């Protein structure tokens, strides 16, 4: 026989009006905030990733692929010089 911890049951929580009032506001708000974060380009600025039109420049149209096992540092320096 288990004791009572004083917590409400899950079924009691999800059937309450208070739960749905709170979550009907917060879940769409989080979705809209995430959409704005990505659509305004702020996500690119915060995380430092290039925008889709910045992956390939006019001077560099090839994929920056490291092919050498022993000269990988030189290849990496060559790729980063073009930025």
Swiss-Prot record:
Indicate where this protein resides in the cell: Plastid, Chloroplast thylakoid membrane
User: Mostly located where?
Assistant: plastid
Q: Which cofactor does it need?
A: heme b
- Drop me one GO molecular function for this one: electron transfer activity
Domain of life per record: Eukaryota
UniProt xrefs under SUPFAM superfamilies: Cytochrome b559 subunits
Q: Which InterPro entries match?
A: PSII_cyt_b559_asu (IPR006217), PSII_cyt_b559_asu_sf (IPR037025), PSII_cyt_b559_CS (IPR006216), PSII_cyt_b559_N (IPR013081), PSII_cytb559_asu_lum (IPR013082)
The record's Gene Ontology biological-process terms are: photosynthetic electron transport chain
Cofactor binding mode and count: With its partner (PsbF) binds heme. PSII binds additional chlorophylls, carotenoids and specific lipids.
Query: What keywords is this UniProt entry annotated with?
Result: Chloroplast, Electron transport, Heme, Iron, Membrane, Metal-binding, Photosynthesis, Photosystem II, Plastid, Thylakoid, Transmembrane, Transmembrane helix, Transport
In terms of Pfam families, this protein maps to: Cytochrom_B559 (PF00283), Cytochrom_B559a (PF00284)
- The membrane-spanning stretches of this chain are 21-35
Show the PROSITE patterns listed in the entry: CYTOCHROME_B559
The Gene Ontology CC terms held by the record are: chloroplast thylakoid membrane; photosystem II reaction center
Family, per entry: Belongs to the PsbE/PsbF family.
- What exactly does this protein do? This b-type cytochrome is tightly associated with the reaction center of photosystem II (PSII). PSII is a light-driven water:plastoquinone oxidoreductase that uses light energy to abstract electrons from H(2)O, generating O(2) and a proton gradient subsequently used for ATP formation. It consists of a core antenna complex that captures photons, and an electron transfer chain that converts photonic excitation into a charge separation.
Q: What is this protein called?
A: Cytochrome b559 subunit alpha
**Organismal lineage:** Eukaryota, Viridiplantae, Streptophyta, Embryophyta, Tracheophyta
